[in-house]
Amino acid sequence: MKNKNLSMPSLKEKLLQETVEHIDITRFDARPIIDAMDHMSFTSRDLARATQIFNRMLQDEQCSIILSLAGSTSAGGCMKLYADLVKYNMVDAIVATGASIVDMDFFEALGFRHYQGSPAVEDRQLRDLYIDRIYDTYIDEEDLQRCDHTIYEIANSLEPRPYSSREFIHHMGAYLAQGKAKKEESLVQLAYEHDVPIFCPAFTDSSAGFGLVLHQVKNPDRHLTIDSIRDFRELTDIKIKAGTTGLLMIGGGVPKNFVQDTVVCAEVIGKTVDMHKYAIQITVADVRDGACSSSTLKEACSWGKVDTAYEQMVYAEATSGLPLLASDAYHRGYWKDRSPRQYANLFKSESK
């Protein structure tokens, strides 16, 4: 007689049953909601104005749009949203945390998933089960370590020399495009295919860091390195080339400061560029702590980073407001008349 317990799922399998499903901005039209919010107050009206500014960026033929991405919204259900911004030519460059790009997007491109969980859980038990928690979202640590090892393999395949994070992520996109992707249309692969550069100024603060440390330990005399100074120079080169720029910033942190500072960096190296003409930030950070993440866009003007004519702070948890902004922009369709910038081509000879 068969042991019935053999077919029963383990506790880990029970906890990792419900996957996070990523929102599809093409399947619902948020225009009526945004139009209604424009006649409301508080955060609703702020979000409506931010959406209007984003649509203005898309209509401005001279404007290049840079997405700044921090936090865990990719794991929380916005992963396809970011990929669609690239697919439909609504962003021209991306500055993100390493976790957003590697631990979340590249991770799912390899066939792994994020799972719906609960913050009301015994975290010591999760640790024993090798389950990582991001508030109410779970990740299988064993899968994450497989992602780390993939970064290690990519690093081993490359010439041992300094790389910008943009260049290394380009090779990650090539890896996926060469038939290694288990999931279609990831952000990393679409950015590779559409020549949209992705920068992670704190690249090693992610799964990439574990893979690259392993690469250096195993190859002490012949290994690659990530050159964050080159990241800054390359992104500043894009700002100089672009002229007029608009920022869509989700969260704050290193990506926000990094992309804003391109104006200052250009000035330091003797180039005259305009401040970022348009800027939107969606955040829950409190301005009173004096941190970069919470600093207002008006404050950024005092540093010479952001103009104040078209700026909007939206104080909201991004997964609740960003899908409305992005859906509205998709359905208004101004992206259809934009020329792709393909800024990755500025560095094509360096990425071979």
From Swiss-Prot:
PANTHER family: DEOXYHYPUSINE SYNTHASE, DEOXYHYPUSINE SYNTHASE-LIKE PROTEIN
Source organism per UniProt: Coxiella burnetii (strain RSA 493 / Nine Mile phase I)
GO biological process: spermidine metabolic process
EC top class, as a word: transferase
Highest taxon, organism lineage: Bacteria
Family according to the record: Belongs to the deoxyhypusine synthase family.
GO molecular function, one term: deoxyhypusine synthase activity
Protein name: Deoxyhypusine synthase-like protein
EC number: 2.5.-.-
Pfam name, any one: DS
HAMAP family in the cross-refs: DHS_like
Keywords: Transferase
One GO CC term, this protein: cytoplasm
SUPFAM superfamilies per record: DHS-like NAD/FAD-binding domain (SSF52467)
InterPro entries in UniProt: Deoxyhypusine_synthase (IPR002773), Deoxyhypusine_synthase-like (IPR023496), Deoxyhypusine_synthase_sf (IPR036982), DHS-like_NAD/FAD-binding_dom (IPR029035)
Keyword Ribonucleoprotein tagged: no
